[in-house]
């Protein structure tokens, strides 16, 4: 019986979506000689979380690491078309600098003030607005139950498909090998990961392995004997229009998890149910908009009472059940050459450039260089010590 041929690489990235492709690109940009293999079971990316998202990118976080990652990612995305051109082909991402608007009730104003102060201290352009100032800036908004809002005009949104394929094409141009396959087993020693076996029967040896499998990363971690509290959580996105006139709106978010933005002649958004059952479920509830989202958008912006939903689709959050923040780093307590970059809980697209850079620095240089992401490491999972955002969803 023929033994499967073992292929040798320096780095095997498990998951070739927006995070894994960012990792591959950033590694090869730093070490052109690196042998990088990316294993992706579905190159159509039909169920990839990023491609089913709204593409938002914003600095409105409270953890300094997330703010700093957003600042870097915004810079990358705004210049992406030219800097990530591959083989003479531009990499358009259709960036729209429409801004973000976070809204809070009166009892959460102090929290928002703290958040804004931290963001401003890190160089973010943030306007803290009273209800009257909100009404002056956005005349259609209902403010009677609001305490304040934070507006970041430099934020916006882009095309996630363009971002993913831009990273992938550039990584391939630099030498990355993409395999259409699935990792089904891992061979480990007490201190290191040694080999992975693919669904096709092929085997890959590597000096380092990166788990960038998104909503599937918890399952991948189990193959290595690692517990990673990242699970899939279904969410809905809706495209809706409104015949009533309304001023241009930024990306609007509030503490109920309502989130929507302009999209062409209409709007794209939804309202995430944090109590949604975990699991790989892509079924669509076609009544969700009318029952949940429409009342929320109509309450906040009364002209949207005439909103009509044209399409609803589902996607998955790679939800970190510990604290909602990503896990970025190596499993230093055991398999020191197994790296995780997963659990972004809805923030993966916007942080893909910075997270990919961070993992690449660990792989190539052995330490974070541009931005210290140590607090987002796996150690907090092992210690059951959450590192949460305050009032940011």
Where are the model-predicted features located?
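Flavin (FAD/FMN) cofactor-binding and adjacent substrate-gating region
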Residues: 79, 103-174, 179-180, 185-192
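Active-site substrate-recognition segment that forms the wall
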Residues: 25-30, 50, 55-58, 82-99, ...
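Dinucleotide-binding Rossmann-like beta1-alpha1 core, especially the glycine-rich loop
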Residues: 55-137, 257-259, 278, 297-298
């Amino acid at each position: 019986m023929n033994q499967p041929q073992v292929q040798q690489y320096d780095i095997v990235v498990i998951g070739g979506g927006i995070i894994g492709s960012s990792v591959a690109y950033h590694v090869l940009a730093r070490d052109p000689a690196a042998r990088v293999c990316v294993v992706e079971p579905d190159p159509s990316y039909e169920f990839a979380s990023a491609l089913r998202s709204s593409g938002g990118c914003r600095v409105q976080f409270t953890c300094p690491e997330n703010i700093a990652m957003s600042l870097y990612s915004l810079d990358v995305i705004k210049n992406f078309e030219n800097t990530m051109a591959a083989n003479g082909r531009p990499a358009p991402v259709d960036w729209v600098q429409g801004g973000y608007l976070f809204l809070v009730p009166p009892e959460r104003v102090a929290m928002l003030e703290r958040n804004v102060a931290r963001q401003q201290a890190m160089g973010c352009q943030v306007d803290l607005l009273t209800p009257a100032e909100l009404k002056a800036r956005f005349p259609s908004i209902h403010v009677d139950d609001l305490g304040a809002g934070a507006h970041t005009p430099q934020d916006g949104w882009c095309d996630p498909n363009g971002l993913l394929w831009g990273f992938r094409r550039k990584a391939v141009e630099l030498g990355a090998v993409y395999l259409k396959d699935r990792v089904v087993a891992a061979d480990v020693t007490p201190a290191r990961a040694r080999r992975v076996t693919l669904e096709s029967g092929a085997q890959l040896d590597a000096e380092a392995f990166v788990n960038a499998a998104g909503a599937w990363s918890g399952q991948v971690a189990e193959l290595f004997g690692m517990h990673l509290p990242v699970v899939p959580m279904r969410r809905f996105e809706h495209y809706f229009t409104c015949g009533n006139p309304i001023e241009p709106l930024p990306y609007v978010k509030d503490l109920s998890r309502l989130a929507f933005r302009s999209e062409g002649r209409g709007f794209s958004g939804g309202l995430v149910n944090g109590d949604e059952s975990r699991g790989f479920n892509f079924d669509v509830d076609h009544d969700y908009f009318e029952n949940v989202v429409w009342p929320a958008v109509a309450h906040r912006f009364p002209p949207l009472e005439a909103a009509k939903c044209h399409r609803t689709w589902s996607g998955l959050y790679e939800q970190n059940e510990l604290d909602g923040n990503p896990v970025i780093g190596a499993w230093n307590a055991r398999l020191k050459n197994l790296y995780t970059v997963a659990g972004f809980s809805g923030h993966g697209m916007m942080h893909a450039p910075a997270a990919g850079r961070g993992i690449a620095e660990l792989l190539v240089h052995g330490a974070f260089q541009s931005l210290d992401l140590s607090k987002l490491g796996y150690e907090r999972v092992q210690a059951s010590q959450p590192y949460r955002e305050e009032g940011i969803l």
